[in-house]
């Protein structure tokens, strides 16, 4: 006896997988920003890159996974906030880690909630 995902579960997982790819790009920008901060270079150029990378993630996740979308929006707010660059980079790294963890947890939950046994579908 096997099992598979129902239609809505498959669609949700595709959305989450696409979001994970986009978050990896966002993580790359944050890590480049951290490297520049360590080398005492200006970080102004990264703010716009972060906003451009985060906007598609937030809009992708908003319809089905709004809490994660809010986390992405908060990351953008942190990137525009004043204060020390070191604290900003630290907060952004934490935000990216929280987003990744939330995406993983949500993917596991979707798999659990939308798994259908093959025998159930054959009887219908």
Where are these regions (language model features)?
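Short, glycine/alanine-rich amphipathic alpha-helical segment
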Residues: 55-58, 78-83
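Amphipathic, coiled-coil-like alpha-helical segments
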Residues: 2-33, 85-124
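Short, well-ordered alpha-helical segments
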Residues: 60-77, 91-94
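Conserved catalytic segment of histidine kinase HATPase_c domains, centered on the N-box/ATP-lid region
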Residues: 39-43, 81-88
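Long amphipathic alpha-helical coiled-coil segments
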Residues: 72-81, 100-104
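Non-catalytic, well-ordered alpha-helical scaffold segments
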Residues: 20, 24, 48-51, 66-69, ...
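Amphipathic alpha-helical interaction modules
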Residues: 29-67
């Amino acid at each position: 006896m096997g099992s598979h995902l129902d239609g809505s579960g498959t669609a949700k997982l595709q959305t989450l997988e696409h979001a994970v790819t986009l978050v990896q790009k966002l993580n790359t920008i944050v890590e480049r920003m951290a490297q520049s901060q360590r080398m005492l270079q200006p970080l102004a150029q990264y703010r716009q890159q972060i906003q451009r990378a985060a906007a598609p993630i937030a809009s992708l996740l908003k319809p089905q996974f709004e809490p994660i979308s809010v986390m992405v929006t908060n990351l953008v707010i942190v990137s525009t906030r004043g204060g020390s660059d070191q604290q900003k980079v630290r907060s952004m790294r934490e935000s990216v880690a929280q987003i990744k963890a939330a995406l993983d947890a949500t993917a596991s939950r979707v798999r659990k909630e939308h798994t259908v046994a093959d025998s159930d579908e054959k009887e219908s």
